[in-house]
A protein has these predicted regions:
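Glycine-rich FAD pyrophosphate-binding loop
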Residues: 28-53
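C-terminal lid/capping helical subdomain adjacent to the catalytic/cofactor pocket in oxidative enzymes
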Residues: 413-513
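N-terminal Rossmann-like FAD-binding beta1-loop-alpha1 element of flavoenzymes
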Residues: 9-36
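C-terminal segments that line or cap access tunnels to active or ligand-binding sites in enzymes
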Residues: 179, 258-260, 265-410, 429-430, ...
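Short hydrophobic core segments
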Residues: 12-14, 37, 210, 254-270
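Helical element adjacent to the flavin cofactor pocket in flavoenzyme catalytic cores
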Residues: 168-217, 233-259
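Glycine-rich active-site loop/strand segments that organize a redox cofactor
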Residues: 44-68
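Mobile amphipathic helical/loop "lid" adjacent to a hydrophobic cofactor/ligand pocket
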Residues: 72-163, 171-175
């Protein structure tokens, strides 16, 4: 814990995931006093690593990274690190995914998709993938495969995924490589990130529990002459501090005064904070609770398997083709674990927890026992890799079973872009309270990812501290990279120019004759 009692900060950032880390990194460049607050004992949010059984790795995964993460790469460079230092090329690509889909699509369905891709526009953000596929007569097999791809790539089913986001998978990612971390993120990425913040004077408090927010009127901190100037307006309210304590033990509360508070969390976590602290009220408007319910990432169940021996696992894309939609990545093909118990490691995820197993006739949510779920996940994994021996270790650590609702509830949450759009950063009640994350829509990258998280953070930081733009810091737009549509458009222009030139040349030759 590094927050001194009754300290004053320019910024208190709640949430130690990629958004919070990026905010702290960028705001520290303005020489502001920053406190980063994280409720867990590790940083990274959904990208973080949980250690169990004397240091064995588990994760909320599997996760991927792409080399068109331009803003993320810029932040890495600011930390003195290159993208390739931390990540290695994945054995599969966006083309792998498209080829999987082409196996079941008819010529008519392919032509329909191509036309929609070439006419891609913002109106597609108002249409779900299911609405599009159903209205254009796609087969059940096509709908099923697109639903499974959506669940694997961006945490959404066909009835929540927007048509715009789905087509952007191809447009923004097809020409780029997919990567995996070279080492677990707590050893690589987040250790480097934390060290950088510490060197720049950012205070970091892990295992932090929020006792309360200190709220009042802006006029309390201003001259009495200003107090009579419409201070009854809701916008005159401010959050002047936050009271924290160490969640691991009974400890004296720590009062941290602040000029601004940023909840760097997905909407579900922001709403949890609002519900737990009535002093904040409906800080982001009366419709925020409904918004967070309608934009929730699918409740995945992550399971990880470790073997003491180095196995020859076939190179097969971990597409969720099984009855529970079990997807996977063989992490040991890419990561160095430096642990004799982890010579082979497969990270698996149940993307369809409500679908029944063809063997058990039960869904994952019907089974409230960890061992029962892990046993069935491994059985379905063997449908992909038939020669897998029984694992030496297996863990389900990222979810807990809620017996009342009969479902596995993940510890980590994320935002899913749906037809319900995005929300603004600033509170409607408090001048100095903000939420920040993918839910704000200030990234041209269409997916819930490391890139969209940090891009939204940089956008807010430069809004709050405009002088950062003078340092050349700005949100890099994905459209500044090469996309498939840009290449196609350029090719059409080139062909048009060539045809025009050929026609003119032919006409001129005719005149000479």
């Amino acid at each position: 814990m590094q927050c001194d009692n009754e300290e004053e900060y320019d910024y208190v950032i709640v949430g130690g995931g990629p958004t919070g880390l990026a905010l702290a990194q960028v705001l520290s460049l303005s020489l502001k006093r920053v406190l980063l607050v994280e409720k867990r004992d590790y940083l990274g949010g959904c990208h973080g690593v949980t250690r169990v059984h004397d240091g064995m790795m588990t994760e909320h995964g599997p996760r991927i990274y792409i080399d068109n993460f331009l803003m993320f790469t810029q932040l890495l460079n600011d930390m003195g690190v290159q993208f390739d230092d931390l990540f290695v090329k994945y054995n599969f690509s966006t083309a792998t995914m498209m080829l999987e889909a082409l196996r079941v699509l008819t010529v008519r369905e392919i032509a329909t998709l191509v036309w929609s891709f070439m006419t891609l526009n913002d109106s597609f953000k108002e249409t779900t993938l299911m609405e599009y596929l159903s209205s254009h007569g796609f087969s059940n097999a096509a709908i099923d495969i697109f639903d499974r791809i959506g669940r694997l790539t961006d945490g959404g089913s066909a009835d929540t995924y927007t048509l715009f986001s789905f087509l952007q998978i191809l447009n923004q990612n097809f020409l780029y490589g997919i990567y995996q971390p070279r080492v677990p993120n707590d050893v690589g990425l987040f250790r480097i990130w934390e060290d950088t913040l510490m060197k720049r004077g950012v205070s970091i408090m892990k295992n932090a529990a929020i006792d309360r927010f200190i709220v009042g009127n802006a006029s309390d901190a201003s001259d009495a002459s200003d107090a009579s100037d419409a201070s009854a307006d809701a916008k005159a309210k401010v959050v002047s501090g936050i009271v924290l304590r160490d969640s691991r033990a009974e400890s004296r509360p720590i009062v941290c005064g602040c000029k601004r508070v940023i909840l760097a969390c997905p909407p579900q976590e922001v709403q949890r904070i609002l519900s737990a602290h009535s002093e904040l009220g409906a800080a982001f408007g009366p419709g925020f609770d409904r918004f967070q319910q309608e934009t929730q990432y699918l409740p995945y169940i992550s399971v990880i398997f470790h073997w003491r021996s180095a196995l020859r696992v076939p190179t097969i894309w971990g597409y969720p083709r099984t009855s529970w939609g079990v997807g996977n990545i063989v992490l040991s093909d890419y990561m160095e674990f430096n642990d004799p118990r982890s010579k082979t490691v497969i990270s698996a995820v149940v993307t369809m927890p409500d679908r029944p197993s063809e063997l058990l006739k039960l869904s994952a949510n019907d089974i409230g026992d960890k061992r029962g779920v892990m046993r069935e996940v491994f059985r379905q994994l063997k449908q992909i890799y038939p020669d897998l021996p029984e694992p030496d270790y297996q863990f389900l650590t990222q979810s807990a079973y809620d017996a009342a609702s009969r479902r596995w509830v993940p510890f980590n949450h994320a935002f899913m872009t749906t037809t319900h759009g995005h929300v603004p950063n600033q509170s409607v009640l408090y001048d100095n309270l903000y939420n920040c994350g993918v839910q704000n829509g200030n990234s041209s990258y269409s997916f819930t990812s490391m890139e969209s998280s940090v891009a939204n953070a940089v956008h807010l930081a430069t809004e709050l501290q405009p002088e950062l733009r003078l340092r050349g810091l700005r949100v890099v737009k994905v459209r500044e990279a090469i996309t498939v549509r840009a290449v196609v458009a350029a090719a059409i222009v080139c062909v048009g120019v060539a045809c025009t030139g050929f026609a003119m040349h032919k006409r001129n030759r005719g005149r000479v004759k």
